[in-house]
Regions:
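Domain-level detector for secreted/extracellular nuclease and nuclease-toxin modules, and
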Residues: 1-253
Length: 253
């Protein structure tokens, strides 16, 4: 339901779509750019069954679906400037700590990006993740988490870091975003209506955790990233849903 459309404009010639499964069930899918060692987006469903209280793993691991040569060794230690940047989950541990195998797969190094720890990863970003988890306790929602180095047509300086146990240069995202979907279906399971909302953050420290102030439409995030989100919705449903820019409208759908 939540997979973005295949990119055909040649913008990311080194990117591959990778499906991560656990016990025959799809856990999440990520669009991994081997040139930047970055998952440009990570898409996953979220419902009550995915969340629980399994203890957080201590170590990360390589993604077995990709060669280690195109991954950054963040297995045992983080980035060289780890006082500032941490391994920021794209699909959070707390969104998969109800099923052990799925949880461990969120600790693949490909499910991380360098993220400011203080007042971002541990602040507004974490608060948004918790809000989405709260909604998903009562219904299934569909999420795409992404990174961007620049908006479409924008010129932006990119800063790089390295891992303590690797020499590969890793670009630090200038933006992080999420787009989220809820659907309503008829008795035959056909989607009859939907609600979406997006969140777009400049990658910096925030003095508060009021994530709702950064809610925008999915249409706007599509314009900034060049990705087409939720293409599996019926066209009329998608067009109506992707104009919403209010968190409360999404919550109350």
């Amino acid at each position: 339901m939540e997979l973005p459309a295949e990119r055909t404009d040649g913008a990311y010639p080194n990117a591959v779509e990778v499906k991560i499964s656990a016990s025959g069930e799809r856990n999440y899918t990520h669009y991994y750019d081997t040139a930047t060692y970055t998952s440009l987006w990570t898409a996953y469903p979220l419902s009550a069954k995915h969340m629980g209280s399994i203890s957080r793993p201590e170590e990360w691991s390589f993604n077995p679906n990709l060669s280690t040569s195109v991954q950054v060794n963040l297995c045992n230690r983080s980035y060289t400037n780890s006082d500032t940047y941490v391994r920021g989950h794209l699909i959070p541990n707390a969104s998969r700590n109800g099923i052990k195998e799925m949880q461990l797969q969120t600790f693949y190094v490909t499910n991380s990006a360098p993220q400011i720890h203080t007042n971002f990863n541990s602040g507004i970003w974490q608060t948004l993740e918790a809000a989405l988890q709260s909604v998903a306790k009562n219904e299934t929602i569909y999420i795409v988490t992404g990174v961007a180095f620049a908006k479409q047509g924008e010129s932006k300086t990119i800063t790089y870091t390295t891992a303590k146990d690797d020499t590969k240069r890793v670009p630090i995202p200038n933006y992080f975003y999420k787009v989220v979907l809820k659907v309503a279906t008829n008795s035959s399971g056909v989607v009859t209506s939907a609600s979406t909302v997006g969140f777009w953050f400049e990658h910096k420290e925030y003095s508060n955790s009021t994530y709702s102030s950064y809610a925008i439409s999915v249409d706007q995030i599509e314009a900034w990233t060049g990705f087409d989100f939720f293409p599996n919705l019926p066209d009329t449903v998608e067009q109506a849903a992707e104009t919403n820019s209010l968190w409360t409208t999404f919550q109350n759908f």
